Amino acid sequence: MNIIFDMDGVLVDSEPVIEAAAIAGLKEYGVEAEPEDFTPFIGAGEDRYIGGVAEKYGVAYKKEMKDRVYDIYLEIVSDKLKVFKGTKEVLNQLTDDGYNLALASSADAVKIEANLKVADISQFLFKAIVSGEDVEEKKPAPEIYLKTADKMGEAPATCLVVE
């Protein structure tokens, strides 16, 4: 059996962390964002998450904005990231029971790596890790799941997705 996990909202709660980093980062570009501004863009990948809010306030999105948000994210993630209770134990038990695990997240690789490190979840538990940077179409499009199954060397029909 093959299980593909999402990261945010499944293994960890990083939304408050990226939100705080985005508010602080966008402020440096003259955007006075509010937490609720980000709600429509949750799960759409960081380019859209940050860019959508910047554009709402009439500021053109630039890649440097995301870079700055990630700088801030990396500074605060160890204090703010919430790991859901039992996450590590469940992942370790599934691995011990012979399940192939993978991670498919719309987040960028830098965020995935930071979250796994802070959560003390070994990347080696996962047969494949696919980020939003690895696909053209974001969720709910199936591309990320198909790519993850392919990277695992498994047929998509043999994979269970936990979102």
List each model region and its residues.
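Active-site neighborhood of HAD-like aspartate-dependent phosphohydrolases
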Residues: M1-P40, K56, D96
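Substrate-recognition "cap/lid" segment bordering the active-site pocket of phosphatases
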Residues: D108-V162
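Structural signature of beta-strand start/N-cap positions in the alpha/beta core
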Residues: M1-N2, N100, T158
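Conserved SAM-binding loop
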Residues: L11, V83, L101-A104, E137, ...
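Metal-dependent phosphoesterase signature
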Residues: G52-E89, D97-Y99
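Substrate-recognition element of Asp-dependent hydrolases with the DxDx(T/V) motif
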Residues: A22, V90-K117
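Helix-loop "lid/cap" segments that line or gate small-molecule binding pockets
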Residues: G25-L26, G45-V59, N115, A149
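Phosphate- and divalent-cation-binding pockets in alpha/beta enzyme and binding domains
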Residues: A21, Y49, G86, K111-A114, ...
